[in-house]
Amino acid sequence: MSATTDEILEKLQSLTLLEAAELVKQIEETFGVSAAAPVGGMVMAAPGAAAAEEVEEKTEFDVILDEVPADKKIAVLKVVRGITGLGLKEAKEMVESAPKPIKEATGKEDAEAIKKQLEDAGAKASVK
């Protein structure tokens, strides 16, 4: 640190609590700022309001494989392998254990594209 900041720091350390409070008040008035710590403004919001806000700001989506008809399993399996990069065994287990998330925390456009691929292969999918 520079000599100036070292001096200021030493002087601040020597202040009494009353002097520190006066200094804070003067800084607030001089610079037009508030030294009050945020008191959980977002945390204090009502649960219903937080849920509504979350829906508006949602940027990450999960693609859920809801259902796979038996006669479409192989086609869906190929699509799932392509999307996830999983091996045959893991992809097969995923397809057979539907409903199951296929892709999590992806953008809206990607999620819709993946959903369309799955539906084109014969599966029922949803974006959440």
Swiss-Prot record:
Gene3D superfamilies: 3.30.1390.10, Single helix bin. NCBIfam families: L12 (TIGR00855). Pfam families: Ribosomal_L12 (PF00542), Ribosomal_L12_N (PF16320). Homodimer. Part of the ribosomal stalk of the 50S ribosomal subunit. Forms a multimeric L10(L12)X complex, where L10 forms an elongated spine to which 2 to 4 L12 dimers bind in a sequential fashion. Binds GTP-bound translation factors. Belongs to the bacterial ribosomal protein bL12 family. The keyword Ribosomal protein applies. This is Large ribosomal subunit protein bL12. Keywords: Ribonucleoprotein, Ribosomal protein. InterPro entries: Ribosomal_bL12, Ribosomal_bL12_C, Ribosomal_bL12_C/ClpS-like, Ribosomal_bL12_oligo, Ribosomal_bL12_oligo_N_sf. Forms part of the ribosomal stalk which helps the ribosome interact with GTP-bound translation factors. Is thus essential for accurate translation. GO terms for cellular component: cytosolic large ribosomal subunit.
